């Protein structure tokens, strides 16, 4: 069902104004803080916080379009997707189902996908208009992440109460299959060419490697306790997985599917993002209220940056 965009509250206009003032000095890391209702903006050149921005009552999922023109936030309390034009211009809020979480955008910036937990669905939004164009029911219960493949053909969907990753054909706007993995799949990442997907399964402490052509898991990589966040290096040679209980990030060599380094970070590391050149990894530490900065070449932590309460993840542009 199509929903017309609605006017944003004053707090969102404050957020837009602040982002407008800083957008020209990119790259910035944007960190949604679920409990404090803010987005922390980090200058990645200096590793310092430059703003704490109001962002609704419960911001969780976050994505930014490849051109850096729009920031997308799921507000779980308002059941809405907030879209902010960067560096300035129109803003809008699109109603969603109950408890939206993970947000993803296609590489061409045309489509936005949001995993909606209590609806057991993935909502597709037209990025240009803000209109809802599809609401796709998935098999997994409480979907958390919905991630586009690099070519935008597929969406992989992880759900907290599942042992599979659901596969959506974006053109058909429906689920067309599923890949068996371990209990509670969470973070999802793709190799640069989209041939391989990596899925962290929290309750089995394992990263599953999926061949997208056959839609089958072809390898299992032991990770730390409560593996959850996943990000793939731009060169495709390494994958990073956060381990919530251990308070670590593991670096996986994709040539051998083995762990090549384990890096201590903060408490309950969650979702992560790499700088465009892949030189730095930013890790949201949900229980430390901080972001850890990792030097990917040296596989070592460089800094911990204080943010808001219960940071959910990071995007960088």
Where would I find each of the regions flagged by the language model?
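Predominantly soluble domains enriched in secretory-pathway, periplasmic, or organellar proteins
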Residues: 5, 13-317
